[in-house]
């Protein structure tokens, strides 16, 4: 049975951890879905790990839709969420409705994710959810604000910053978000947020007290040339693939592949 947004909330109530990962193509999405991942996010992180951009900022709505269509063809069980990229929702609720509507209509995804929880974004979330578009929030370190942050530092360390993030979490929950991504914040702040909101919190670099965890699949598979300190590679595919290609190349050059026909 396919995972739903309501099911995630039920799992929070039961204390059942939520497993989430990113995917950007058909093959990886199929593997994740078959492995029983609960939530698959087509993140705008694809700009950095798949398209080669330095940040997520250049990613377009068309690029998100293109990759999300491929993922949708593979996913049968997991809940599929797609990021709204930079400047496709910040201008107005109407812009957000148009962008989110395109994603749901053209890709078949069940929900969208957007960053920040300030007053304007909370109102946008309220508008989206009021017309039936499920929204996942994302607070703490929000990559679309990389230049404002001056990089990717941990957020919420100062008391005023911690209070602001908590306020954003409460506002997004009140606005109707079905879940929150908490990125790169202190574990005690993530714990406080998790205890105070009725919707699931999905941590990425936010400690062990969240209702679930998410990582970029390239980091999990050891494909990234750099990964954040909170990521954990479970295999080193970067090395494995490089070695496999070198062996293939050597066999071709020595005419060992393909094998000549037997006499």
From Swiss-Prot:
Main enzyme class: transferase
Record-linked InterPro entries: Pantoate_hydroxy_MeTrfase (IPR003700), Pyrv/PenolPyrv_kinase-like_dom (IPR015813), Pyrv_kinase-like_dom_sf (IPR040442)
Catalytic reactions on record: 3-methyl-2-oxobutanoate + (6R)-5,10-methylene-5,6,7,8-tetrahydrofolate + H2O = 2-dehydropantoate + (6S)-5,6,7,8-tetrahydrofolate
Binding site for 3-methyl-2-oxobutanoate: 44-45, 83, 113
GO terms (BP aspect): pantothenate biosynthetic process
E.C. numbers: 2.1.2.11
Protein name, per record: 3-methyl-2-oxobutanoate hydroxymethyltransferase
Species this protein is from: Trichodesmium erythraeum (strain IMS101)
Organism lineage string: Bacteria, Bacillati, Cyanobacteriota, Cyanophyceae, Oscillatoriophycideae
């Amino acid at each position: 049975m396919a995972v739903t947004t309501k099911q995630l909330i039920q799992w929070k109530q039961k204390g059942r951890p939520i497993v989430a990962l990113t995917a950007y193509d058909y093959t990886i999405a199929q593997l994740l879905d078959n492995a029983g991942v609960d939530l698959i996010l087509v993140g705008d992180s694809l700009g950095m790990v798949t398209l080669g951009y330095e940040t997520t900022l250049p990613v377009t709505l068309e690029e998100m839709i293109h990759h999300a269509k491929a993922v949708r063809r593979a996913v049968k069980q997991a809940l599929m969420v797609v990021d709204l990229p930079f400047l496709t929702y910040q201008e107005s609720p109407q812009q957000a409705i148009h962008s989110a509507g395109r994603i749901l209509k053209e890709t078949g995804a069940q929900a969208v994710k957007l960053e920040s929880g300030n007053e304007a974004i909370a109102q946008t979330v309220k508008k989206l959810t009021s017309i039936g578009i499920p929204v996942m929030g994302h607070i703490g370190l929000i990559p679309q604000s990389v230049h404002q942050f001056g990089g990717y530092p941990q957020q919420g360390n100062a008391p005023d910053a911690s209070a602001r993030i908590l306020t954003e979490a409460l506002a997004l929950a009140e606005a109707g978000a079905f879940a929150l991504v908490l990125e790169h914040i202190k574990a005690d702040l993530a714990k406080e947020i998790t205890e105070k909101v009725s919707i699931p919190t999905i941590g990425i670099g936010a400690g062990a007290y969240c209702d679930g965890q998410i990582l970029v699949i390239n980091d999990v598979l050891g494909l990234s040339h750099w990964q954040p300190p909170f990521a954990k590679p479970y295999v080193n595919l970067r090395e494995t693939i490089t070695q496999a290609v070198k062996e293939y190349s050597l066999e071709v050059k020595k005419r060992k592949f393909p094998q000549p026909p037997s006499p």
